[in-house]
UniProtKB/Swiss-Prot annotation:
Gene assigned in the entry: rps10
Species of the source: Thalassiosira pseudonana (Marine diatom)
Name of the molecule in the record: Small ribosomal subunit protein uS10c
InterPro entries: Ribosomal_uS10 (IPR001848), Ribosomal_uS10_dom (IPR027486), Ribosomal_uS10_dom_sf (IPR036838)
UniProt similarity note: Belongs to the universal ribosomal protein uS10 family.
Keywords linked to the UniProt accession: Chloroplast, Plastid, Ribonucleoprotein, Ribosomal protein
Amino acid sequence: MEIKPNEKIRVRLESFNHELLNTSCQKIMEITQNNNVDNVGVVSLPTDKRIYCVLRSPHVNKDSREHFEIRTHKRILEISYDSSVNIFDLLVKSDLPPGVLYRICLS
């Protein structure tokens, strides 16, 4: 896949664990710095919070409930560069830890 100069690559990262997400951002930034790409910006997106309400008892006591929440932390890395290095292949081949969902968009 050929990439034109002055193009932008957006990498969207999502995870339930914010520490894992930050280490993944650092790893991608190291990959870009090793290939002489300096135009990297990290944008934190709002955290999604889902709350699930569950009855504790199977039959009665509707007043007794438990609440569980799942937080989804999100970041966007915007990489703009002007070089002959194929950053897209390096990002696809990068070994990110399990538990981090990433999407790579070319624009």
